[in-house]
């Protein structure tokens, strides 16, 4: 078996994508963009045995300096989105060998832990991966099967959504795909939308993030805008398109129009657009933190199809991981380790209720 971590410029990365059903999150261009804005070194674990392959895009990051560890350790994680392992192997035993090879190569690279976000549409089957690997299911996501007929697609849309879409059309709102003239307005409205919904910090992005995303992804990125009958921009969404999968990436609505829910019209039109272009799936994603919240219920109004979002938490070097967690706990005695947070030593320090910082 050939197995090693490769860089985005390695031709084998592109060869895998040419042979496999994949998503935009597997593209080297996406990982490069993520590295710039999330931090870390863009890499992918690559393994090949016979005609089978296994690819896992990650960002390799140095350990937090506050831990004061002098060893050349680091960790690796999936970037924002749904990269996850990509393979053409469907045999559980051989997949387990591929995964074991990934852990071995990570250890040789002094990677202490791996945090992998699986793609809900391309997840691995259930595997026996040992006690140092935890596979956690977080919740459902919503997707549209674009192989369905127009009638089936329309029937799957919740009646309340259909009513509001008809009202928007009657009032003269319209959708234009790839109208990049409104992109700057979208970027401004995105920040205001995040403020309005009290989004957590990780959902805020700089202006450079958006412009770099457009430059880096090029034809794989699409922008849909909603305008009034008078031409005023009121809402916009970013979509990615790769490997027959369209992802609903980011969305925003101008404050004064958010009660009209123009994004419902935008998504209905975008689903039809994606189907006309020959795509297989339109993935709307899930709720915040994969919860079945108001965001999830909004998305669920477009389709009855569900998939599951899960993560893989891998302790590559258990002794080092235990030591790093102990060191973190000593440095932050007022903050209990949060169950389920991985890797634990990257948890932000917050005093327990009633204690001063």
Predicted regions, residues:
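Aromatic (often tryptophan-rich) hydrophobic motifs at membrane interfaces
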Residues: 46, 100, 209-323
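Short catalytic-loop micro-motif centered on adjacent basic/acidic residues
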Residues: 114-115, 176, 281-285
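Short, high-confidence coil segments that cap the C-terminus of an alpha-helix
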Residues: 40-42, 108-111, 279
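Conserved acyl-donor/pantetheine-binding loop and adjacent beta-alpha core of acyl/acetyltransferases
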Residues: 60-82
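A conserved beta-strand-loop-helix scaffold within acyl/acetyltransferase catalytic domains
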Residues: 2-67, 118-259
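A gly/proline- and charged-residue-enriched helix-loop-helix capping module
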Residues: 76-125
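Active-site/acyl-donor-binding loops of N-acyltransferases
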Residues: 60, 127-152, 279-357
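A short, internal acetyl-CoA/4′-phosphopantetheine-binding micro-motif in the GNAT/acyltransferase core
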Residues: 81-92, 147-148, 251-260, 288
């Amino acid at each position: 078996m050939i197995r090693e971590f490769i860089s985005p410029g390695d031709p084998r990365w592109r060869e895998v994508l040419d042979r496999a059903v994949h998503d935009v999150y597997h593209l080297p261009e996406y990982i490069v963009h993520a590295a710039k804005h999330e931090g870390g070194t863009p890499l992918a674990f690559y393994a090949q045995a016979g005609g089978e392959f296994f690819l896992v895009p990650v960002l390799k990051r140095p350990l937090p300096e506050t831990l004061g560890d002098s060893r050349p350790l680091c960790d690796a994680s999936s970037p924002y989105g749904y990269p996850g392992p990509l393979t053409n192997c469907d045999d559980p035993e051989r997949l387990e060998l591929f995964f074991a090879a990934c852990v071995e190569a990570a250890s040789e690279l002094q990677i202490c832990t791996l945090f992998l976000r699986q793609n809900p549409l391309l997840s691995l089957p259930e595997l026996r991966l040992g006690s140092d690997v935890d596979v956690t299911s977080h919740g459902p996501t919503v997707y549209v099967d674009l192989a369905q007929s127009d009638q089936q697609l329309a029937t799957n849309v919740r009646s309340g959504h259909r009513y509001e879409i008809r009202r928007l059309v009657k009032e003269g709102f319209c959708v234009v795909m790839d109208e990049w003239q409104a992109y700057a307005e979208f970027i401004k409205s995105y920040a205001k939308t995040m403020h309005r919904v009290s989004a957590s910090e990780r959902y805020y992005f700089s202006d450079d993030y958006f412009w770099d995303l457009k430059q880096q992804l090029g034809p794989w990125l699409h922008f849909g805008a909603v305008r009034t009958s008078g031409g005023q921009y009121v809402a916009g969404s970013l979509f990615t398109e790769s490997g027959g999968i369209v992802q609903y990436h980011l969305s925003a609505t101008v404050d004064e129009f958010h009660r009209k829910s123009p994004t419902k019209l935008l998504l209905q039109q975008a689903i039809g657009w994606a189907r006309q272009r020959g795509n297989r799936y339109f993935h709307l994603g899930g709720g915040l933190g994969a919860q079945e919240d108001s965001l999830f219920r909004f998305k669920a109004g477009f389709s009855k199809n569900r998939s599951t979002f899960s993560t893989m938490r891998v302790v590559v070097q258990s002794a080092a991981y235990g030591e790093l967690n102990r060191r973190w706990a000593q440095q932050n005695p007022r903050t209990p380790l949060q169950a389920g947070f991985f890797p634990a030593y990257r948890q932000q320090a917050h005093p327990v209720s009633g204690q001063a910082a």
